[in-house]
Structures are given as structure tokens and as C-alpha cells.
Regions:
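Non-catalytic, solvent-exposed interaction/assembly segments
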Residues: 1-108, 150-152, 160, 184
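A short acidic Gly-Thr/Ser loop motif
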Residues: 13-20, 82-84, 188-196, 201-205, ...
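A structural motif specific to WD40 beta-propellers
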Residues: 36, 207-209
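Active-site neighborhood for divalent-cation/phosphate handling
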Residues: 76-179
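Small-residue helix-packing motif on alpha-helices
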Residues: 101, 229-237
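Adenine-nucleotide phosphate-binding core of ATP-dependent small-molecule kinases
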Residues: 234-259
């Protein structure tokens, strides 16, 4: 199993705070992708945060129900790993053939991975020659706690599915949203319910990957308190009007402006 790569016929699963999403595509990176299957199911966050066997069973039933709803037949699955559970960095190592790079990265990883290398699942991708030193290669290094990765895989495989890949959500976001061939600097942001992932792109590759606490829920609370409205109303205002200054007399914009 690879942390970064999925191959063959498969579908992808993303378990969020209050929903699950799954998608199956056809095609390839060169010719383009086509959406084949898709499912979105709201989930009580008490279930997604419940690590008990009962909670896992309920979540598993929802996942299988969503798969059936989407009409997905393949059992091969790629799972998104939350950014807060992964560590991603760009490092530079002496340029060398792939086999030697593998050994070098394993050695160098100990300096970057915020856990014991023996307790981590580590994968990497070669981005190319370093713009700072032609004798070095730029490496996208990604890691997660091995016990966590194995726990997630075990829970999913108990549903009769075959995990072929686990990928950090920020990296999946880059592959899905980053424009192909764009070389200038771009920032891609994913505003989640309780945290926000951001990736800075340059010359077609991620250069900075971060997950920061605070997400949509923080905005909802701010608007709720400022406009004296219910939680569901505040959420609707934000999703419908955003930061538009000409909507709702600019009240949502003003509430979030100085947050």
C-alpha cells in the first residue's frame, strides 16, 4: 500500500466532520478525467468522532450505504487522511538514481518527521531538480503515524473493501484543483468545519502545506453572535452570501471582517 499513490480501478473516500463524500473517476491525467460516480451523505459528527466499536459500525454502515447509492461496484478504495494526522514537507537531498534516493530519504526523514521513523508510515515523490542547487533533488515527503494508518485501513477493510492507497487530504486537494501547467505562485485553501488546510503552489508543485485550527464553525459562531441569529441561519448566510458586501446589507461581511 502506498501513502501517496493509487493505481487501477478504484474510488476515493473522504470522511469529514459532518459528512462523507466518495467519488469515482474514469480517464487519466493526460487525457483528462470524467466523473463516473459520486455520493455525499450528511453525518452526525458524534458518529464521525466516535472511536468506539459501535461508532465505527454506524459509520461503516453509512459508508456502504453511500457506496450503494452511488452505484460504485469496485471494492478498491483510496482513503483521504486528515491533514492534522499527517506531516508533509519539501526537502532537498543529493540527486541520485531512484533506488539510492529511497535510502537517502529514509535516512533524512528522521530530521523532519515529528515522530519516530520506526512508528511512521513514510512515502515520497520526486518533484525534480532543486532550483537552489542543481546537484540536489526536491522531494515531497509525507508521513503519518503508522498505528493510525493501520487502524483506518483495518476499519475500512472490515467492510469488505480493499484499501489500495492512503493520501493526505492537502495533496489530494492539489491534484484535484491545481491548474495544469501553471508556474506562478498559487494558494489553494480548503475551509473545513473545524480546521483549514492550505497549500502554496509554485512551478506546478506544492511548496508549503499547513493545517491550521479554525474553520467554518468559527465563522458560524461569529456571525451567530454578531447578528443574533440561530446556528443554522448563520451557516446559511455564510454559505449563501459569503463576503459579498452588497448582500444582507453587508452584515455578514462586517461580522467576519474583523474576526
Amino acid at each position: 500500500m502506498s501513502l501517496l499513490h493509487g493505481v487501477g480501478d478504484f474510488f476515493a473516500l473522504d470522511i469529514g466532520t459532518n459528512s462523507i463524500r466518495m467519488i469515482q473517476l474514469s480517464g487519466n491525467a493526460e487525457k483528462g478525467w470524467t466523473l463516473d460516480k459520486f455520493a455525499y451523505v450528511p453525518v452526525d459528527q458524534k458518529i464521525t468522532k466516535d472511536d468506539s466499536e459501535t461508532g465505527k459500525r454506524k459509520l461503516g454502515e453509512i459508508i456502504l450505504g453511500a457506496r450503494e447509492q452511488a452505484g460504485i461496484k469496485t471494492k478498491n478504495i483510496a482513503i483521504g487522511l486528515p491533514a492534522r494526522k499527517t506531516y508533509t514537507a519539501i526537502i532537498e537531498v543529493p540527486n541520485a538514481p531512484q533506488r539510492e534516493l529511497t535510502q537517502t530519504v529514509k535516512y533524512e526523514a528522521d530530521q523532519y518527521v515529528p515522530m519516530s521513523v520506526d512508528e511512521a508510515k513514510i512515502d515520497f515523490a520526486v518533484l525534480g531538480i532543486s532550483p537552489n542547487d542543481a546537484k540536489k533533488a526536491e522531494i515531497l515527503l509525507s508521513s503519518t503515524d503508522n498505528a493510525y494508518a493501520e487502524s483506518v485501513m483495518e476499519s475500512v477493510e472490515q467492510l469488505g473493501l480493499n484499501v489500495i492507497a492512503q493520501e493526505p487530504e492537502p495533496i489530494a486537494m492539489v491534484r484535484a484543483l491545481a491548474p495544469v501547467g501553471v508556474q506562478d505562485a498559487r494558494m489553494i485553501i480548503d475551509l473545513g468545519e473545524t480546521s483549514t488546510d492550505l497549500v502554496v503552489m509554485y512551478q506546478g508543485s506544492p511548496r508549503l502545506v499547513r493545517s491550521i485550527p479554525g474553520g467554518l464553525l468559527s465563522f458560524v459562531r461569529t456571525v451567530e453572535n454578531s447578528l443574533k441569529v440561530r446556528d443554522d441561519q448563520a451557516r446559511q448566510f455564510i454559505l449563501k452570501f459569503g463576503l459579498a458586501q452588497d448582500k444582507l446589507e453587508g452584515k455578514v461581511f462586517e461580522a467576519l471582517r474583523w474576526r
